[in-house]
A protein has these predicted regions:
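Acyl-CoA/ACP chain-elongation machinery
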Residues: 29, 172-218, 251-265, 295-302, ...
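Short, well-ordered amphipathic alpha-helical segments that serve as non-catalytic structural scaffolds
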Residues: 68-79, 133, 160, 232-233, ...
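Feature captures the FAD/FMN-dependent oxidoreductase FAD-binding
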Residues: 65-97
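Conserved catalytic cysteine-centered active-site region
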Residues: 26-70, 76, 100-163, 172, ...
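Condensing-enzyme catalytic core mediating Claisen C-C bond formation in acyl metabolism
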Residues: 22-26, 204-281, 289-290, 359
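Conserved small-residue
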Residues: 18, 72, 93, 137, ...
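ACP-dependent fatty acid/polyketide chain-elongation machinery
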Residues: 1-57, 79, 235-245, 342-356, ...
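Flexible, low-complexity linker/loop segments at domain and module junctions
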Residues: 85-88, 281-287, 315-318, 367-403
């Protein structure tokens, strides 16, 4: 597995900070925020792209590709895979982004207005389009299996992982490198989400701005980074002695068919999605132990996900823990499902549920167990990671304790 995110640039550091409830939310300093309504976010800190790419390579890529490549390289190295002429066509890549090269697009648009089309870089298009993380990973390692990138807003990472698992299940690959990446803390990214009134405006206290299920939550916090996992057919992994973090046992999808940005009333769409994941995993509701929630800290979204859990799990919803790591990382949009798949797998490995920090006054309409402000040691055999996106696109992966 590999990760680059606001609380750490590798799996070990990020997980340690998540379990200890460390916030990665800080004032934004990569752009001038003087005219912005929101001046903070979940930035990646102390990232050194030269650890992963040469200056020549990095120059041809937007920052979202830098993050995706870094997480992908970490995951590939962690897997211990060796690519040979005989297995290359059985290894593929599915790493997406919700928005893609927004920074490069903004800068190129400014350059076009100032100096005309002849000054546009020949690398503008390949440096900014979303599928180039998968493309560059394939080129770097000579991976000749399926090579694609799903784009579904904030569900992107989860859909790439889930669909990659289906590729393996269908027999089209033995191994898939999958996840999501994003770098949208740009002038238009920050300004656009603020204009939609989706973001917290708690500029005076960034660290507590992301407060899922708290009665005073006022929107999500924009974050950047990438999360990538290596999926492998079990017998194939077992034969080569691979380290197995867990089993991706279920995958569910659904559509709200309701509104461009709001969740369906009562969480009905999200509930169907979770039910589909459990059905695919062949487990009953009462076998689920933990949910890594979408949990974005929006007024409508947090209630809808609480209602969805109740609808999907019935009375058992009172027995599970559902926490939001976005309280520490912010919302990484297309990368959210990637980093949260990593956190969910580690929760199962270490038998501990990450906390939801910043719950100071729990909303009475959100009445489940959210592991408020402190990690919870507990039995976790089966866990769901949820992602829900604009357009009513929903995805849930179900990870189970490995054989």
């Amino acid at each position: 597995m590999g990760i680059v995110c606001p609380v750490g640039n590798n799996v070990s550091d990020a997980w340690k900070n998540i379990i200890n409830g460390v916030s990665g939310i800080t004032p934004i300093d990569n752009i001038d925020t003087e005219l912005q309504a929101v001046k903070f976010g979940g930035a990646v800190k102390d990232f050194d792209v030269s650890k992963y790419l040469s200056p020549k390579e990095a120059k041809k890529m937007d920052v979202f590709i830098h993050y995706g490549m870094a997480a992908g390289i970490q995951a590939f190295e962690d897997s211990g895979l060796e690519v040979t002429e005989s297995n290359a066509e059985r290894i593929g890549v599915a790493i997406g982004a919700g928005i893609g090269g927004l920074s490069t697009i903004e800068k190129t648009a400014d350059l076009f207005r100032e100096k005309g089309p002849k000054r546009i870089s020949p690398f503008f298009v390949p440096s900014s389009i979303i599928n180039m993380v998968s493309g560059n990973m394939s080129i770097k390692y000579g991976l000749k299996g399926p090579n694609f990138a799903i784009v579904t807003a904030c569900t992107t990472g989860t859909h790439n992982i889930g669909d990659a698992s289906r590729i393996i299940e269908y027999g089209d690959a033995d191994v898939m490198i999958a996840g999501g990446t994003e770098m949208s803390s740009t002038n238009c990214g920050l300004g656009g989400f603020a204009a939609a009134r989706a973001l917290s405006t708690r500029n005076d206290d960034p660290e507590t701005a992301s407060r899922p299920w708290d009665v005073d939550r006022d929107g999500f916090v924009l974050g950047d980074g990438a999360g990538v996992v290596v999926l492998e057919e079990y017998e194939h992994a077992k034969k080569r002695g691979a380290r197995i973090y867990g089993e991706l046992s279920g995958y569910g999808m659904s559509s709200d068919a309701y509104h461009m940005t709001l969740p369906s009333e009562g969480g009905e769409g999200a509930a169907r999605c979770m039910r589909n994941a459990m059905r695919n995993a062949k487990i009953n509701e009462d076998q689920l132990d933990y949910i890594n929630a979408h949990g974005t800290s929006t007024p409508a979204g947090d209630i809808a996900e609480t209602d969805a859990a109740k609808l999907a799990l019935g009375a058992h919803s009172k027995n599970i823990v559902m926490s939001s790591t976005k309280s520490m990382t912010g919302h990484l949009l297309g990368a959210a499902g990637g980093i949260e798949a990593v956190f969910t797998a580690l929760a199962i490995r270490d038998q501990i549920a990450p906390p939801t920090i910043n719950i100071f006054n729990q909303d009475p309409n959100c009445d489940l167990d959210y592991a408020a402000n402190e990690a919870r040691e507990m039995k976790i055999d089966h866990a769901i990671s949820n992602s829900f996106g604009f357009g009513g696109t929903n995805g849930s992966i179900l990870i189970s304790k490995g054989p």
